[in-house]
Design a protein with these regions (language model features):
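Active-site-adjacent structural elements that line small-molecule/cofactor binding pockets in enzymes
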Residues: 1-269
């Protein structure tokens, strides 16, 4: 927070059992409770007070009978610019999205389609918002995708840019998780791409990554990225705003990145 001049946002996510148990080496247990504990401890830490916390997955200091017994409440040495740094939660599935809307400052969805996201997450967001502490303010939403702005991005050239997103979507929908425990595949199906999601996963897990990328629906590419002439992008941004998006998280492609961001700013302003 100090290095960025008070612009830092901390992002949390529970990922899935394949990554947590295969890469981090700990059981995938109580993921939502763990994230809530992390959020609570972080908020206590930033207030520069000695941290004493007892949650279902995190206890600070360690309880009596664990460790050496030498642990004691400590406080942070470095001073952040703010004592309430925004925490965004990257969540995808039902109860975790509800918990995000209740506890976090912001939400980081993936493959965000502003016209369809309510059919996937609407009920969960509403349930969490109903229990949200009013002092935390409105839930912030960060979404975007690739961005390329210009009259040249139509027809074949537009499709060439959108096709750049195919391998990444195929990786997540097809291979980011076990066959019966892939949250990204579930989201793709909830968007209405049931057959396509199954095909992507079948191809990816069989080693046909190119075929998996080719099976990504063209509509999904179109709706989850910002590629086209300025007028078209303006309409898309209006849809994002209507959906409640407060932060644009974009990857400039198809030209000079600085110029693309400047064009985006002009449209927003």
């Amino acid at each position: 927070d100090f290095v960025s001049g008070g612009r830092f946002i901390l992002c949390h996510g529970a990922t899935g059992p394949q990554v947590i148990e295969g890469f981090h080496g700990v059981p995938y247990e109580n993921p939502m409770a763990r994230i809530r504990d992390y959020i609570n401890v972080c908020r206590m830490t930033w207030k520069r007070e000695p941290v004493v916390y007892e949650g279902p997955t995190v206890q600070v200091p360690l309880p009596e009978g664990q460790g050496t017994g030498l642990g004691k409440p400590l406080k942070i040495i470095n001073h952040p610019v703010r004592n309430d740094i925004p925490i965004f939660w990257a969540s995808l599935m039902g109860l975790s999205v509800t918990a995000t809307a209740q506890y976090a400052d912001g939400w980081l969805p993936i493959f965000f389609d502003p016209e369809k996201f309510h059919q996937v997450w609407g009920d969960e967001l509403k349930a969490g918002t109903a229990k949200r502490d009013a002092n935390r303010g409105q839930l912030q939403i960060s979404a975007g995708g690739m961005v390329a702005i210009g009259d040249e991005f139509v027809g074949e050239k537009k499709q060439q840019i959108l096709d750049m997103a195919r391998p990444n979507i195929a990786l997540y929908v097809g291979g980011m998780g076990a066959r019966d425990k892939n949250f990204y595949n579930t989201i793709c199906q909830k968007y209405g791409y049931v057959d396509e999601a199954i095909e992507i996963q079948d191809r990816y897990l069989s080693g046909d990554k190119t075929g998996a990328a080719g099976a990504v629906p063209a509509e999904m590419l179109e709706k989850t990225n910002l590629v086209g002439p300025a007028g078209e992008i303006k309409e898309r941004l209006a849809a994002y705003k209507e959906a409640g998006v407060t932060h644009l998280s974009v990857s400039p492609v198809g030209g000079d990145a600085v110029s693309t961001v400047e064009k985006l700013r002009e449209i927003i302003d």
